[in-house]
């Protein structure tokens, strides 16, 4: 089990991480979400041992994780970290990059291991290609295979699918997260992609300004967000006075409402004017105005700009 106990970290007099504590059980997939600059990447580096803590402790089982002050070579053998810059060797082939840290004593075993990992990340056909000739998305997939090569106990992933095409990313995510579950590899992923959070994480940690402000299942955080900030990490969200939605007569009390939770009705207190319409494939996202406030809602068909409609909650 990984455990962080009240850790803090300062960079150039700015407190980047402040009093963070949480624990992760073996085999769990945990997502870290939050706005850019909230400390997600720094937290992964601290867990890996790349930085020294100002305060607190990090433990993996009975092993204390410490920074470069205590280790000549930072990082732990049983933990693998995939940074956003990939760190591939450009002048060696894809298969050589993936097998870089595997022993050469049992060459057939090494060859088989590399082949299976390249199949996992759908890069088998590029095995003999030098890394410098790959696209950013292809390099990212190779880097992912490489950190899995030695089958770590804990995997730290920083935006691991950010450069991969959408049509390929969905299947790749399913393959990788299924593999991690099958092998009981604990994983922490820092991401901006709500699909990675909702579909694959067992728990989600929400960060804001270097602090952990929420830890819960992704389903709970999505359905019952503690704040507009948390809800906004999953997509567009509206803050609507409850009396406009027939909840109460208290105009100061607001309800967080996602676009899919609103629908057009014949009449209601929420009268909006259509400002813009965005085609989303199976529906339109409508941007509208209510008393100088923006309200987003989904609609099955396009609406002309300036159209007045009434909204209420989907029953």
Language model features with spans:
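Non-catalytic connector elements of ABC transporters
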Residues: 12, 248-315
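Helix-to-loop junction immediately C-terminal to a conserved catalytic motif
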Residues: 48
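Conserved ABC ATPase "signature" region
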Residues: 109-126, 178
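Conserved ABC ATPase signature
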Residues: 130-134, 138
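A short, proline-enriched helix->beta-strand linker immediately N-terminal to the Walker B motif
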Residues: 149-153
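Conserved ABC ATPase "signature" C-loop
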Residues: 209-210
């Amino acid at each position: 089990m990984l455990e962080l106990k009240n850790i803090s970290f300062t960079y150039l007099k700015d407190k980047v991480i402040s009093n963070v504590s949480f624990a992760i059980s073996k085999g769990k997939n945990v997502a870290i979400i939050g706005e850019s600059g909230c400390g997600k990447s720094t937290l992964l580096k601290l867990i890996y041992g790349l930085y020294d803590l100002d305060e607190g402790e990090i433990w993996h089982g009975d092993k204390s994780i410490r920074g470069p002050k205590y280790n000549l070579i930072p990082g732990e053998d049983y933990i693998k970290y995939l940074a956003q810059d990939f760190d591939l060797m450009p002048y060696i082939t894809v298969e050589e990059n993936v097998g870089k840290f595997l022993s050469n004593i049992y060459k057939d075993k090494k060859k088989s291991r590399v082949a299976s990992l390249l199949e996992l990340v759908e890069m088998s056909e590029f095995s003999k290609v030098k890394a410098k000739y790959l696209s950013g998305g292809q390099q990212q997939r190779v880097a992912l295979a490489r950190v899995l090569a030695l089958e770590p106990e804990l995997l730290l992933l920083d935006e691991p699918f950010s450069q991969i095409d959408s049509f390929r990313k969905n299947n790749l995510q399913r393959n990788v997260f299924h593999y991690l579950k099958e092998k009981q590899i604990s994983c922490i992923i820092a991401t901006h992609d709500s699909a990675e959070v909702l579909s694959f994480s067992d728990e989600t940690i929400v960060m804001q300004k270097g602090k952990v402000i929420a830890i819960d299942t992704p389903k709970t955080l999505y359905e019952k967000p503690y704040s507009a900030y948390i809800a906004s990490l999953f997509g567009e969200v509206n803050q609507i006075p409850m009396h406009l939605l027939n909840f109460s007569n208290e105009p100061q009390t607001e309800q967080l409402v996602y676009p899919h939770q609103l629908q057009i009705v014949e009449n209601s207190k929420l009268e909006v004017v259509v400002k813009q319409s965005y085609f989303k494939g199976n529906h339109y996202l409508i941007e509208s105005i209510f008393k100088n406030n923006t309200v987003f809602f989904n609609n099955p068909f396009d609406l002309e700009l300036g159209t007045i409609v009434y909204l209420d909650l989907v029953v």
